[in-house]
Amino acid sequence: MQAEAGGVPLLLRAPSRRRRGGLVIAFDPSPPEGREAFARALPFPSVGAWKAYLGLPLVGYRQPHGGVEEITRRQRSDYLLQLLDPALSDAVRDLAVVVSDLRKRLDLAPDAPLGLFGFSAGGLAALLALADRPIPIAAAVIVGAGPDAEAAVAAAERAFGITYQWTPAARVCAARLDFPARASNIARGTPALLVIRGADDEAVPATGIDRLHAALRPNYIHAPDRLRFETLTGIGHGLDELGKVAALADDWLSEHLTDW
């Protein structure tokens, strides 16, 4: 059902079963016409928790004033500082507000476990939430997200035919989005983390994901079963391919959120 929490529009799905009531937030980067399809592709049927599908700021059905033309202007003017970073930063701020509101409205315990799912830019938002950690996060699934701002900018250059001009301000911003460098922040409390890359995903370089894995692994030395990286064959970077990772994501979140 369509809902709102903390002033943020979202789709909300009740659990088919639940124990003490956790919550899964899925960051949705899909266009307006794909909003319902995103939620249908990721039902998380085994997870005994409420699911909230939260649109990313500045994209999809949360486009800025001016719509697609304004998004295009930002892409070409300064993709990182005017589009990507504001979208990710606002998403992390939204997360804390939405979770607080939903816990009150749905009568969830204050310490009910929180799981995240993010695809593409939504995956970057989930990684940033793990690194900044505005609220405790028990588990996360990241799909089709690069390891840092440089990879995201390179993908945008290929997709939109732009040449990005790196400025000192952009370099400062990129440091916050350098997730291998922030591995110790991401791993605080050893949240259960599953990272999935499609073998055919040209937007996410395998070398970058390997670097993220190498940076995170030492932080999970005492809990190796809580960190998993998977490369799946026959999967690229399309929203229409999320169904191919749905079962894996469902299993992971179910395993790590229902022990509570």
State each model region's role.
Residues 149-221:
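The feature captures the conserved acid-bearing segment of alpha/beta-hydrolase catalytic domains
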Residues 30, 199-201, 233-236:
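Acidic beta-to-alpha connecting loop that harbors the catalytic carboxylate
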Residues 210, 218-260:
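C-terminal catalytic histidine-bearing segment of alpha/beta-hydrolase fold enzymes
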Residues 72-106:
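Alpha/beta-hydrolase active-site loop
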Residues 62-77, 155-159:
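Short, flexible, mixed-charge acidic loops at enzyme active sites
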